[in-house]
UniProtKB/Swiss-Prot annotation:
Species the sequence originates in: Xenopus laevis (African clawed frog)
Role this protein plays: Component of the elongator complex which is required for multiple tRNA modifications, including mcm5U (5-methoxycarbonylmethyl uridine), mcm5s2U (5-methoxycarbonylmethyl-2-thiouridine), and ncm5U (5-carbamoylmethyl uridine). The elongator complex catalyzes formation of carboxymethyluridine in the wobble base at position 34 in tRNAs. ELP1 binds to tRNA, mediating interaction of the elongator complex with tRNA.
Keyword set includes Ribosomal protein: no
Compartments where found: Cytoplasm; Nucleus
Entry protein name: Putative elongator complex protein 1
Amino acid sequence: MILVKANLSLLGGAKKETQFHGSEGKQAAQQKIMVVKPALPWDDHKPRITWRGDGQLFAVSSVCKESGTRKIRVWNRELALQSTSESIEGLEQALSWKPSGALIASSQSKPNKHSVIFFEKNGLVHGEFTLPFTKGQIKVKELLWNSDSTILAIWLEDNEKDESSSGCCVQLWTVGNYHWYLKQSLNFGTDEMKKIECLMWDPENAYRLHVFSTGWHYFCFDWFWGTDHSDGGQGDVAVIDGDKVLVTSFQQAVVPPPMSTYFIQLSCAVNEVTFQLEPKKNSGIAILDSTNILSIYRYGNSTVNDPTVKLGAVSGNGFRTSSQTPKLEKKLRLPRNACDVQLRSFRLLTWVQDDTFLAVSQESNSSISTVHHMNTDQMDGQDINVRDVGTITGHIISLCYSPNTKHCALQTSNGKIWKYLCEYPTPAVEPWIDSMGQEVKFPQPCVQTALASIEGEDMVIGLTERSRLFINNSEVASNITSFHLYEEFLLLTTHSHTCRCVSLRDTSLKALETQLNSASNPNDETIRKVERGSRIITVVPCDTKLILQMPRGNLETIHHRALVLAQIRKWLDRLLFKEAFECMRKLRINLNLLYDHNPKAFLDNVDLFIKQIGSVNYINLFLTEIKEEDVTKTMYPTHALSTMQSSEGAKAKKVDIVCDAVRAAMEKWDPQKFCLSILTSYVRRTIPQLEIALQKVHELRESPSTTIVSADEALKYLLFLVDVNELYDHSLGTYDFDLVVMVAEKSQKDPKEYLPFLNKLKKMETNYQRYTIDKHLKRYKKALSNLSKCGPDYFTEFLSFVKDQSLYTEALELYPHGTVEYKAINAAYGDHLVSKQQYELAGLIYARCNSIEKALDAFIASGNWHQVMCMASQLEYSGEKIAALARTVAGKLVEQRKQADAAVLLEQYAEDYEEAILLLLEGAHWEEALRLIYKYIRLDILETNLKPALLDAQRNHMILFDNQKTTFTRHKERLSVVREMKEKARLGLLDEDVTGCAEADLFSDTSSIMTASDASGKYSQSNSRISSRSSKNRRKAERKKHSLKEGSPLEDLALLEALAETIQMADKLRGDVHNLLKVLILFEYDARAKELQQNFDDLLLLFETSIPEIWPPSVQQNTAAPILGPHSTANSISISYQHQRNVNISMQDSELFTAPKLNKNIQWKLSLLL
């Protein structure tokens, strides 16, 4: 017994009396309710119960005892009545609650139609659709929703009095854009043994339908969503809508179903549609209806209208469409013996060749599938010639064909792939074998398959219901919602709401897998964001449109950048500049690609480019966008470099090349029409040729009757391209005052500003006038040239101008050698160089103008003693004066530690050979000192000076080597300690808190390039103060930057720097030690020489063995790079980010991580001492 709550309050306006009735007013609620007729005669009067998907509510359809009509009541789990439907006349017994919970479906027989109606849970009607039958033709037995609420199955029976002879069928309906589509119609005929007894959807597989018949026959139907589209022509896509096929030509119009470009009207429900797979052209469309009639439509030039093909949303009265429509060629029947094998025997219909179709069938009560070869070259109305070409163990669930390779792939329910060989003398079916000799089998069965060429091999691509994408035996991605193949591209949509466009050309399966699973780069052109739930419908052939469909049914057109660039490159390869330009302009592709794609082809066909583009505005747009950047390497890189740089491009600049080539073509084609574009070509050069452009404007003004563009229009256009002040200055630079006035009149300048200046210029002599203009425009070189032409009276002003602008080299070119002006310029130039402390060059300049005294002083200051003696000779100095000069210069050379040069001066010019010998001994030039000793027979110096100097030098070297060895060893040991501390800190093994420690951020051998923020802040502030100090203080601060103080933040850097300096300093002593050893041996100091050689050899050996320890490979490869990846830790990631912040420090100190090189080419040892 069911207990019901009596007083039920309906919220939300569920009662009709509380509803708004519009213009009828509240009186409408008081109108007398019409009497509703009782339930239909064939109604079994049994109640129907249906539950909502979540089990919280259920609905009951029952016949009222009082009125005899059916009503729907909604109850909750506690048996509390929630609502009662309105009294609906003709309401039938069928009842099904949509699992998603939105609607309750039932059926209604109306006076003029039969409908499926929907109720909300409050009992009010919410929408309906009409069944494609006449009044009283059928009766609705049951309605069933599939588990994901996307398909509504309707069980229908003929409304015959004799039930034993009545037929039955099942229709599958879907909804999109608020329109209901009849997608499939399954006719079970009138055979009593095939009459349906039970119909149900699979609870797990949403697209599997189970049917049981009276004769104990069991049928299982599996469906998958697919898109029927053409591969060429107009980009046609077909949608099944009951007895109509809606066809949209996306090349002509993008309209979402149920709208279409045209539709094909059939006499009964359509079950399958297939296009002839011919790339780049519309060839035909074949339609298989529920009565197994195959209708073949072909595209052609026929002008006869086909009554079955009607225009849709893109046309109407008074409108014409450019879309091509097909014409019915013939209708053929499937043979009855084939149709009677099993219900809807033929499926997966595919049009593979002109008169050839493929289809598959399933044998009753068997797992054997048969592949059928269907020939359709018969006459209209005849049976199709069907031939079995092979059987496969298993249920074939997909079939795909490639018109390029003529291969066909079939997939069974276990994922195994079979190949249909249609090109063999006898068609056959065999397992698909890959290049490794393995059978291809998807890990899971796929609902969509396609054939693609990858690495020169045909591979099968498959997508499962769970978004897993397979290529042959490999899974390449697991988040794919749809895919589409277009030429060499694989387009995919993903669960992350992106659309990828991947080129299959010159790629491998491994690279493709890596690309699909890698994180997207912000600048990656192969990926773009799309709306949530988007699915690919088609790509319009020979265009850039990619059509996506949203979950609610509406369409979106996008132009994926990879597709756009590929199409543009094809147009450019075919020299279709206009198509490429218009696409680039519309989709905002950089116009530099027109040239950069193939510079040689562009320059060779620039006349064709001008002819195709034709528009002055378009050519101006192209010229203004040209820049030096090669966009094929920066913005739009390709794997295969298609560009071929011209030989001219290697020398000249790209902008100049393009401007000159385009201008030459325009002047050849029609200079009057392209006048403004020619001006643009002058302005857009690397160095704008504004004077020539202005001269062109002036020519237009001189001959206005012969031009299309007036001078005023041209000048206005130039003012649009160039700043008015800049244009005024360039017009002034032409020295044409008429042109200057013309530009000034078009500007906003006040005549009081420029007229007095122009009047003053007109009164000047021509050269001086031009000098004044160039000086005003700061064109100093031209001004200097014009001033030099004014004559000797203006030379004083000329020289003053040279000094002011430092134009000495330019001035020297304007006067011949030997003239007074030439010498005066040289003298002034020499004075200028002396002020810049360029003494040697100043001396040369003075010497050229015979200012020998000044040249002598300059050479003395520069230390060039050879030229000093030359100048002294020219001045005819006396012997005493030359000796004094030699002593002065020698003293300066000694200060510069050039004792050998000073010794030459003292010996040859001052004749003080003894002082020369002492200087040579001081500079350790032992052999040269010996030469002078024996030359001047001063053997006493051997005992008094040479031998003591030798012993002192040996002793000093010994002390130096010991000090270097001690210092080097100490620094090396300290570096090991510092590195060990920082390695422990990196591994987190130190007990104390390392956050505030100075070494806390130094976590590896080379981590000293990542300085702590405290230290970096300290040194950055220090550097800002250092910038204003003297060079001496800057060098001092630089030395203090890396402190050797223990515990300093950069101690390891300081140690590396000190060790490298020690090695380099000692390595440079090889030659000095070699020379000292020779002289020690000469004077029989063998023991001291051997000791020196051994100590130096030990020091170098220490350096050589220590370098790999101090600079291991990990240090030289900069292991402080970001530590990321699966083995990274929180500390390492933090360090990586800190490394990026301190990249400048790493650049400055990177040389410290390179080991110093020892010069082993110098043979410094003496074999006598070994």
